[in-house]
Amino acid sequence: MSQEKNEMFESEWSKEREREKQLASGLDTAEKALKVESEELQKSKSELICLYNEVHNLPGESESKDHFLIACDLLQRENSELETKVLKLSQEFAQLNHFTLGGKTAPSNLITSENTCKDPESNEPILETEIQSRKEETEELCPKLGERKQKEIPEESVKEGSFPREGQKEEGSQQNRDMKDEEKEQQLTMKPEEIVRLREELSHINQSLLQSQSSGDSSDDSGAQHPSSGEKLKYNQQGEVQQLHQNLHRLQILCNSAENELRYERGQNLDLKQHNSLLQEENIKIKIELKHAQQKLLDSTKMCSSLTAEYKHCQQKIKELELEVLKHTQSIKSQNNLQEKLVQEKSKVADAEEKILDLQRKLEHAHKVCLTDTCISEKQQLEEKIKEATQNEAKVKQQYQEEQQKRKLLYQNVDELHRQVRTLQDKENLLEMTCSQQQSRIQQQEALLKQLENEKRKYDEHVKSNQELSEKLSKLQQEKEALREEYLRLLKLLNVHVRNYNEKHHQQKVKLQKVKYRLTNEVELRDKRINQFEDEIGILQHKIEKEKAIQDQITAQNDTLLLEKRKLQEQVIEQEQLIHSNKWTISSIQSRVLYMDKENKQLQENSLRLTQQIGFLERIIRSIHIRRGENLKEFPVPKWWHRGKLASLPPTKKQKEIYSTEVFTSNNAELQHEDESVPEATEKWKHSEQMETTISDILESEVVNEILPLSNSSFSGKGLVESFASLQETEEIKSKEAMASSKSPEKSPENLVCSQNSEAGYINVASLKETHGIQEQDQKSEL
């Protein structure tokens, strides 16, 4: 049972090791995935930084706006100058009206009117050039304003997202622009009134011309008498009037074109107003966002400081955890070594048990073969080995239990460490996200600061340039013709730039879409990975619960094992007590065996002596038989002698008595029949019987002398007792025969002596055989 339980524990240990390896591999894969995600994030960050740099380069293109604004200011001033010139022309037309009304007056007035008419003729090419230049400038400004609007829209979106501080420093410039727009509106409201005045004046001029023509016709009728001087004046006046009509027609065309331009400028002003209102709203939003961003910056700085401290603390914890993991691995290795030692000791114990069984068998065999000394020494050694093995088993079991407790604690520490690692990884991810966001915000804010500083510098430069431009206005009027040629080039360049800008804008949109697509894909991948990690966490939790259940089972099994161990210890104690008792019995048996060995040796010596004596007796008996044969040749032997042989005598007492009586009766009967046939041989028989009695007495004395020292030895005593009993029986038989002989006087004393001698010899030989058989039986029983 203990071996099976140990195997179960070892299998559970192997399973737990495999689970630990799987967890370690899962952690490695998670760390690799985190590294890959961090690399992808760095790549996306680098791409975003490139895009931000491209967006930062866009304000460089917006610097051309300032040049267009300067050109607009110049055009506004030129418009004001043209308006002053138009006022002058209106005054001149008023003078012409007065001249036409007073056409009948002196020729001096005509001369003045000619001068005045000549003045507008001289002013016409100037006005035409100015109007054409104005048209060209407005045509130049229209695409520039369109480009400016197109540029302002993405710039505003960029400013709202990444440059929220521009509104604070552009407030002054926007206020100046608002003032300029109001002045333009006032000028535009003034321009239509002036145009109406010009039209009225032109209508008056037309009426005056018609009146002058009618007056000229009447003067032709009246002045027919003076054809020479009057006709010249008329022709001159008619030519002047035609020229004035042409000039008026040209002026009307110019006025219509000016009205169209004014309408176009009004529409542009309305668009600019709407754009300014939108910009103001956006500025307000940007201010609010700036405040929020500043607060977030402060919070983020605080968070950065706290997170850096936490990050350092987490790194220290990670190092400590790594050290604990190393210690845990070392403890696991030591546990493995101890388990191997346990297995080796168990194998040694099994071998020792097998040896014990073999030795027990040998002990039994040694008891049979009487080799107890060597068995006792080996048994003592084996007992010592068993004690050492039991002690080693107890120590190893204690170490195993301690290591199991340590392992449980280590597993708990590992679980806590895994949880701490997960929390630290989450915190690291949050820290990286917050740091990246804060770095991007800081970069954006630094870029905004740089841009605002550049704008301040530009604004100061613009102020200085405005002062210089006021001085250079006179020079610019001369350079207008050169600028016209350059304007065509600029238009072409603008078209090219617009196309390039649109292409870049489209490319940027495509890049942004790609970045968005990548970001969405990365977010989806992260979500999938997060779900996978959550599933793995659930599986691990389920496994941990299973491990806890297994640990509970193991504890229950340990309790049962402890109970079984106690029972086994009690059994071992009982067995030791039995072993002690067996030792005492074995020692007593050994002492007896030694004693019996000594007795056996003595008995063997006695048996050798007896065999020698038996051989000696057989020789004597042969010699007696030989002598008897010689005597029988001389004297025949009776039948009763053949019946009274030693081999045919019964061994027991009763049978001996019965046999003796039967022999006695048969001998008496035979003697009665044979007494008549052998009366003469009595004397010879007496002599032979005396010889036999002497020999038998000698033999009896020798046998008794040899048996008496045997009685003093430590023999079992059965043979001696039986020998004495047989002697007593022989004495009783002799006494009975004596009684019978006394009763039957017919029997001769010779027959009695022969029977007594034969019986004594028979008893001696039977006693010797019985002692020899008893010794063999004792040896067999001992074996």
From Swiss-Prot:
Q: What keywords appear on the UniProt entry? A: Coiled coil
Which residue stretches, if any, does this entry annotate as coiled coil?
A: 22-98, 165-497, 527-622
Q: What is the reported tissue distribution?
A: Expressed in brain, kidney, pancreas, placenta, liver, thymus and prostate.
* Basic and acidic residues bias spans: 1-22, 131-191
Q: Is Coiled coil there in the keyword field? A: yes
Please list where the region (Disordered) is annotated: 1-26, 101-191, 209-231, 731-755
Keyword Repeat attached: no
Record field: compositional bias (Polar residues)? 106-115
| Family classification | Belongs to the prefoldin subunit beta family.
**Record's PANTHER family?**
COILED-COIL DOMAIN-CONTAINING PROTEIN 30 (PTHR34479:SF1)
Official protein name in the record = Coiled-coil domain-containing protein 30
| Annotated organism of origin | Homo sapiens (Human)
Write the lineage as a comma-separated list: Eukaryota, Metazoa, Chordata, Craniata, Vertebrata
Q: In the UniProt record, what gene is named as encoding this protein?
A: CCDC30
